[in-house]
């Protein structure tokens, strides 16, 4: 699919309030310029368009049209509608929160200033969708905010509202996947309290209480109560500097079990999953999950859900690599509205580039069922024949 054809689909009248000729041309120019320049800097975007007018005139046109609050909502709705058409009941809705920093910035609207004015940043919540065994994804929503934006209540509220917006567009189809590393416990608690949201969440707060019949237990206590019946060997690719001076392929024995519990805040019955990992050089580690997924009594169902969660890291890594190739921190707009629209248009370009790349993993899988290829430090011994093959 060409970028022009993707733009036509994004701007189709059926997706949202119809765009006028000026807005349609602007969207087409921005997608082409962002893709061609690999940048969110308006000067570089304008230069990539190579229009038969002065660079200053192109820049001025883009900047003027970028200041449009209605267009922010319109394009965001279009991108969400376009993606939500592909979301089914088992689609992973992966939630990731990051920060967009501008060092020594002073004049950007609603930009909170960090201590000593050295660094300041906006929060960005991205929700991307991926099928359970897929090696690709598609963006659904990018939401930008800061503590200074009028009406701000809390980061947790911003994340929760983003999740609800996506689920409204998908008619509550899809399962929210959260690795609590970037999403706060407060945001997770809001999701747990909602009886309609389906989720698979790694829970950092082990003191969180759940009900088993008439008794309450912390997740820490539940880890000891649940038998981890099903297990298998996985190989984890560990980055340089964690276990040594080179990449390491770590052999892991992964075993899991689950038990039915109730969430006190909602009274909703869910499954608690205990995931334990152990290697030849590391002690056993237990991780608690809560999920609304049912029918997890078989090995295939439970370990399949665990695999789906573990592979989420590969999808996020691929997304971060692609997103960062556009150097989003190099934006040079002063208004919050322009930044919102820039980030939404970037998500659209990412959606296009992912769609044309096909179902191919652009980065190494962190977790694999067999040893990773290459010259790696390994925590296990390879058979001689395998050693020859993997070193090629």
Model-identified regions with their sequence ranges:
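Residues in flexible loops and secondary-structure boundaries
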Residues: 48, 70, 103, 297-298
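Short, positively charged, Gly/Tyr-enriched micro-motifs
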Residues: 12-72, 176
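Single, function-defining residue in the core of a domain
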Residues: 1-31, 39, 78, 120, ...
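Active-site-proximal, Lys/Arg-enriched surface segment
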Residues: 31, 59-134
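Short, well-ordered amphipathic alpha-helices
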Residues: 45, 126-128, 160
């Amino acid at each position: 699919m060409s970028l022009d054809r993707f733009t036509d689909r994004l701007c189709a009248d059926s997706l949202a309030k119809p765009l006028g000729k000026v807005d349609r041309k602007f969207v087409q120019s921005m997608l082409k310029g962002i893709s061609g320049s690999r940048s969110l800097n308006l000067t570089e975007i304008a230069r990539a368009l190579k229009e038969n007018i002065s660079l200053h005139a192109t820049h001025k046109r883009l900047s003027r049209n970028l200041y449009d609050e209605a267009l922010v909502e319109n394009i965001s709705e279009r991108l969400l509608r376009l993606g939500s058409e592909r979301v089914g009941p088992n689609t992973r809705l992966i939630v990731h929160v990051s920060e967009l920093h501008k060092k020594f910035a002073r004049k950007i609207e609603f930009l909170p200033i960090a201590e000593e004015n050295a660094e300041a940043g906006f929060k960005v919540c991205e929700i991307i969708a991926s099928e359970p065994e897929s090696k690709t994804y598609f963006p659904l929503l990018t939401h930008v905010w800061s503590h200074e934006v009028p009406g701000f209540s809390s980061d947790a509220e911003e994340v929760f509202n983003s999740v609800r917006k996506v689920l409204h567009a998908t008619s509550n189809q899809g399962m929210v996947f959260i690795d609590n590393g970037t999403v706060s416990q407060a945001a997770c608690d809001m999701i747990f309290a909602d009886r309609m949201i389906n989720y698979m969440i790694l829970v950092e707060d082990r003191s969180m209480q759940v009900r088993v019949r008439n008794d309450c237990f912390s997740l820490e206590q539940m880890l000891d109560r649940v038998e981890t019946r099903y297990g298998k060997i996985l190989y984890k690719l560990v980055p340089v500097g964690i276990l040594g001076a080179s990449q390491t392929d770590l052999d892991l024995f992964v075993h899991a079990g689950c038990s039915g519990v109730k969430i006190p805040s909602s009274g909703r019955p869910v499954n608690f999953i205990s995931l334990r990992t152990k290697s030849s050089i590391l002690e056993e580690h237990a991780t608690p999950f809560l999920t609304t997924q049912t029918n997890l009594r078989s090995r295939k169902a439970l370990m399949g859900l665990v695999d789906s969660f573990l592979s989420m890291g590969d999808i996020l890594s691929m997304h971060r690599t692609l997103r960062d190739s556009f150097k989003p921190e190099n934006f040079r707009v002063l208004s919050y509205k322009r930044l919102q629209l820039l980030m939404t248009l970037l998500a659209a370009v990412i959606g296009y580039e992912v769609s044309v790349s096909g179902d191919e993993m652009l980065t190494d899988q962190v977790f694999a069922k067999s040893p990773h290829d290459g010259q790696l430090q390994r925590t296990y011994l390879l058979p001689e024949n395998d050693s020859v093959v993997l070193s090629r």
